[in-house]
Amino acid sequence: MNATEQFLAANAHVDEAAVQPLPNSRKIYVEGSRPDIRVPMREVSQDDTPTAFGGEKNPPIYVYDCSGPYSDPAAKIDIRSGLPALRAQWIAERGDVEALADLSSEFGRQRAADPKLDELRFPGLHRKPLRAKAGQNVSQMHYARRGIITPEMEYVAIRENNNRRAYIESLKATGPMGNRMADILGRQHKGQDFGASIPEEITPEFVRSEIARGRAIIPNNINHPESEPMIIGRNFLVKINANIGNSALGSSIQEEVEKMTWSIRWGGDTVMDLSTGKNIHETREWIIRNSPVPIGTVPIYQALEKVNGKAEDLTWEIFRDTLIEQAEQGVDYFTIHAGVLLRYVPMTANRLTGIVSRGGSIMAKWCLAHHKESFLYTHFEEICEIMKAYDVAFSLGDGLRPGSIYDANDEAQLGELETLGELTKIAWKHDVQVIIEGPGHVPMHMIKENMDLQLKHCDEAPFYTLGPLTTDIAPGYDHITSGIGAAMIGWYGTAMLCYVTPKEHLGLPDKDDVKEGIITYKLAAHAADLAKGHPGAQIRDNALSKARFEFRWDDQFNLGLDPDKAREFHDETLPKESAKVAHFCSMCGPHFCSMKITQEVREFAAQQGLDEAAALEKGMEVKSVEFVKAGAEVYSKI
């Protein structure tokens, strides 16, 4: 499929499915210390508790929202114009950037001057690229280390708290039982955080201190002012990344923009554009201009295209030009496989699956062809100079990650991890933000060792892992094999999880696969937050459990990660609208619903003047008679 044939800029349009608010949800904005700090959240309204169960009010809950303006009915979305430059004023008022007269990248200038690309080109960008003034450093880490709390830091502090205080106050205001409701629905289990330092409330100062220490990053390139600030770090909510991108086999620019908007609708905190096909530069421009979340790339992929796929022909000059090209477009973080050293390559010879990272294999081939260390390693300090001029964060790539559980935690993988730790300290010397990429394929009992060694070697820089996949026997289900490992390593301290779709190892994911991967990983990340005891993490669980106990079916659907699928599954069995208010579910029917029985036992206890234990015994006698009369079947059709 040729992207030029499939896509014309004049015909570009937003995916209508991505701009509809989710059921019973509305976009709200929590204002910060200045009017232009407006932090988006999703408010999910709930029905009142039925009179039979007390008839109380259930105030709305607030959900972390990555969807940007797309789910705001008040926003006018035209992907040919791109999103508003939310951060432009914040960037300008710091006084440390300059607008360039032209693109600095030779390749970027070539693309801009090519009239054959006019019909493909994003038409809505009318500003010049920015770069730090001479001698300046514009990274969030640099500001943090100087004691400056930026608007971006305040923004993420508000975002991380999820309006929890307002929710608790709204519970207290529901009536005479309000304080008790606040106590019950705000309660959560004490977690096990494995040495993390998660405060009860996230403050802007805490955000600043974590970034200054290197334990967290805010990936916000100065040339991506459309992005809504978010934070990646062990002491914050676990984030997820979605991969998109075309290949030589297919996919158009329109399709990739739709994958991005679809990813963020369902909860993608960042998106990586891994395009390897035609028109990579133009595809990336469309994605960045329309993305409210950070965009990451693997620059070596595009550099390889520039030398017609011959790894040995790559040079530092080509790679450097690619970094600048992408930085001036607004890429927020680069995966750079600088830890693939010549001495590590022979260590992979006895592996079952060799080197499976594309970037890792490219650099291994270059090292062997030239018999010297890669230019990514030898020019690392020069790369740091580029990164801090645009505030691009490093995602130090694990080019030697294991591609099978057979190869997990071997000397090549762990040797590279030590080198990534050394490179982290060099980047930090330049006040450049860093996250560390991790595996891969690792059985469950070996996962914690990965986390412990990463914390040790990389001095608590945020860990970003692909899964890991915990078994290799389930092609078509690797979103599940990896979701297991993702939940575990997220609990142990990983800051961001890279999603895996059902198509992993099999083909390019479509929109349905993207959604399946996102939902699986949102679930894994949330399970990790619960296990760590992240303050407020259990609020949504408690609200949904209360709705389930009170048979508020619509609230159960709407409070879930995927309201559409929950409603679809329920309606397959009970399609009538009356079933949405039924006091039983589609599995056990009206006579044997455990929650209905519990409700009846409580009512019975009140009527008989018994405590619940005595009522339970007597009530079960009554239920046993009903069971026999109904035919003595464990499950019944309705």
From Swiss-Prot:
Record family assignment: Belongs to the ThiC family.
Binding of [4Fe-4S] cluster, residues: C585, C588, C593
Annotated residues for binding of Zn(2+): H441, H505
Residues annotated for substrate binding in this entry: N243, M272, Y301, H337, S357, R358, G359, D398, G399, L400, R401, E437, Y464
MF GO annotations: 4 iron, 4 sulfur cluster binding; carbon-carbon lyase activity; zinc ion binding
Protein name in the entry: Phosphomethylpyrimidine synthase
Keyword Methyltransferase in record: no
Organism: Dechloromonas aromatica (strain RCB)
Keywords: 4Fe-4S, Iron, Iron-sulfur, Lyase, Metal-binding, S-adenosyl-L-methionine, Thiamine biosynthesis, Zinc
Superkingdom of origin: Bacteria
